[in-house]
Structures are given as structure tokens and as C-alpha cells.
Amino acid sequence: MKRVLVFTHDTFGLGHVRRSLHIVRALCRRLPDAAVLVASGSPALRAVRDLPPNADFVKLPTIVRTGAPGSQPPHLPLELREVTALRASMLCAAVDAYRPDLLLVDNFPLGSRRELLGVLPRARQLGARTVLGLRDIVDRPEIVRASWTKDGVYDALQQLYDLVLVYGVREILDAGAAYGLSSSLQARVRYCGYVTAGRGALRDAAELRRELGVEETLVVATVGGGGDGFPLLRSFVQAVRMLRGLTAVVVTGPLMAPGERDRIRELAVGHAGITVTEYVADLPSYLAAADAVVAMGGYNTVAELLALKQRALVLPRDWRYGDFAHGTGPTVEWEQLLRGQALERLGLLRVLPRECFEPKALAAHLADALTAAGALAQRGRAPIADIDVDGAERAADELVHLLQSEGCHVH
């Protein structure tokens, strides 16, 4: 029986956990007799109800990013270094007791504060193959290169990883070249495509629109987990109130602060066409039925929109988590903006300018997009270019192949 250990980091939001669980499900379908253990500090693990029967998780003490550089443990009254040491010891204990055949690490080659520096060699010493999964875009290439050089990531990649899976496509970013990987490391890189929940059956769009009472136009706004989504949804609700004939569904996500969610609901009071909800069980059906979607530029949200071929209006977050008060300054977080710009160049979505955090500007852009969408509908919807959204399946195939292959570790 093969044993797989998946480590997913618990930075603010749900993206890393959701992406990892999509891959876990695809892997478990291929290896129903394998054991798959997920280790993370993400609070989102507590809400997971649909793990495969041959999978389970280990909850680590949580570390989340804050608006300022660095991280802080949100629950245990311990110093960050103590929580980091505790997490590292728990992971080492899991490796020793579980003895995985494969260790998959999500996006952070050394974990938080280098907590995997002892875990990876121990896993390999016990015979595990080790794989790093990278987001389509980590950050600006020059920032990644500087950070990886400072933290010793290049040496770790060379010595401690057998394979690097990129959860994106080379047309968006050639990670090997952009991040300065050596030729031997680039030979270990596999582009898997975007990781999504898969192509499940969608509800009938006309039926869903009738259920929502849509008379003219349906607009859906979604901000992923929602922890950083308040500025966009605040602007969106006020923008909808400036336009006529709109039915709007506003999905705040489970991580939005209760006070912020209450404020969004207050802004919607008196407008019968605006529904504010924390969660929608079948969000893809709502996105597919909408005349327009307004979203942030996080990985999971964008990947699902690509899978649906829904041309969304995307307003990327370019400030640090919790730091929107300073969001009028220069861009300090590049991931969402770079992703949006690259996909916009391919005609797959439309990036909104930062001014759309003001309701009047967002209302103008939304009205323009709906007018354009109406014109397209009258003359036939223009086809949207295909982009690979089978990342979970292809990543699972790569992992199975590595598990079944013979030979020593790559160095």
C-alpha cells in the first residue's frame, strides 16, 4: 500500500488547501488503496466534509499572514518561533510514524520559516520521493529570485526535490526561466494546467435565474475565502445600487470578518435585487448563469472561471493582507495582478483598474461590460480560447507515475 503525505501551507485564505484537496481527490480516484494524509495549519481543514475515504488530515498549529511583513500565530499564546518549532516537530513525527512513499509540498519549498528544512531530508532518508507544487505565478520573478536566493531555496530544490509541478501553463509564465532554475532543475518541471474542482454537472441556467427572480441581468460577485474581499464587495454593492435592472448575488466567503459581512448586508438593505450570502454550495452554476462576474484575482476563483469560459471582471488585490488602508500606495503584492494581466492578454478576462474600489468607477465599468456582453449575445457569443484546466488530473498522473517508478532520488 502506497502512502502519500501532502503538506499545504496555511497562509491567509483558502487557496492552498482547496488546490491541494482537488489534487488529493484526483489522486485517491487513481489509487483507492493508497493512504493519503494531509498536513496543514489552515483553519479551513475543520470545514472539510468530503475527503475521500482513504484520506485524512493532521491539523498543525495555525500560522496566518498579517498585514505587516511576517506572520503570527492566531490562537496559541506562544512566540512565533515556538509555534514554528512545534509544527516542525509534528511534521517530523508524522514522517517517522507514517513513513510516506511520497511527500507533496504546496507552493512554499521550505514551508513557513524554513520549518521543512529538517522534514524533507528525513522523508527522503526513509525512502520518500519529494515533489513541490507551485502556483501558476508565485510573485514577480525578481522578487522570487531574491527571496529564494536569500532563503537557500535553490539549494533545497536541487538537493531535496525530485519533481516540480507547476499548476499553470507555460504561456502564462515559464517558471523555470522566470525564476532562474538551473537546467537540471528545469528538466524536473512539469506544467500541469490550472487546478479546478473538475467539470461537474451545472444546474440549468434558465431555471436558476428564475429561482433568483432575475428579470433582466444577473451579476455575481465572489471573493474566494473572503478574508481580503471586503473592499471589493463594498464597492460592488454600492455600484449595483447605481444601476437599473440588476439582480446581484454577493458571496462573501467564510473567512470574511463578521463585522465586514454585516456591513455588506447593511449596504444591501432596501434593494430587493441584492442577495448577500456567505456560501453557495454550487457556485460554478451561479457563475455560469451570470451575465457578468466580478471577482478578485486569486488562483482558485480565476481557475474556476477559466474552466467555465466565463469572461469575468477581475479586480486584483495588490496590497498585503489586512493592509487595504494603505492600498493607495505602490503595488506590493503582484501575484493577482500579474495573473490577471497575463490572462487578459489572451482575452480570457478583463482586469479592472484600482479606481474601481470606488463605487462610481466600478458602476461605469460594469455597465460598459454588460453593454458589450449584450452586443455579443445578439450576434453570437465569441468563442473563448481554450486553456488547460485539467491540472488536478495531470498532477495526480505525475504523482502516480513517480510512485510507480523505480530508481533513486534525483540530485
Where do the model's predicted regions map?
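A nucleotide-sugar donor-handling region in carbohydrate enzymes
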Residues: R135-F230, P258
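Donor-nucleotide binding loops and adjacent catalytic segments primarily
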Residues: Y194-A292, L337, E355-C356
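A donor-sugar binding/catalytic signature common to diverse glycosyltransferases
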Residues: D282-L338
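C-terminal amphipathic helix plus adjacent low-complexity
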Residues: A364, L370-H411
